[in-house]
Amino acid sequence: MASSYTLMLFLCLSIFLIASTEMMAVEGRICERRSKTWTGFCGNTRGCDSQCKRWERASHGACHAQFPGFACFCYFNC
């Protein structure tokens, strides 16, 4: 009885692991690029995200540190 339970648990975990690795492969890569439409200091990530989506057709955007301050970066599906 205990060995059948162990076998069933092993099979369920194996199927779960195979399914989760397949899902990751579907997501694809995301490419990062500095915004071409944002100018100046980026202190508002929500504004950067909105501008990247509307003006540059990106998936999303965010402010990140870049010497000497912060810049808006847009993220696209590669």
Curated annotation (Swiss-Prot):
Superkingdom: Eukaryota
Print the organism lineage.
Answer: Eukaryota, Viridiplantae, Streptophyta, Embryophyta, Tracheophyta
Mind telling me which Pfam families this protein's record contains?
Gamma-thionin (PF00304)
**What is the annotated localization of this protein?**
Secreted
Q: Which PROSITE patterns match?
A: GAMMA_THIONIN
- Keyword Disulfide bond in the entry? The reply is yes
Offer one example of a GO biological process linked to this entry.
defense response
Q: What is the designated name of this protein?
A: Defensin-like protein 19
Describe its function. Confers broad-spectrum resistance to pathogens.
Q: Which residues form the signal peptide?
A: 1-20
Gene Ontology terms, cellular component aspect? extracellular region
What are the protein's UniProt keywords? Antimicrobial, Disulfide bond, Fungicide, Plant defense, Secreted, Signal
* Family according to the record: Belongs to the DEFL family.
Intrachain S-S bonds: 31-78, 42-63, 48-72, 52-74
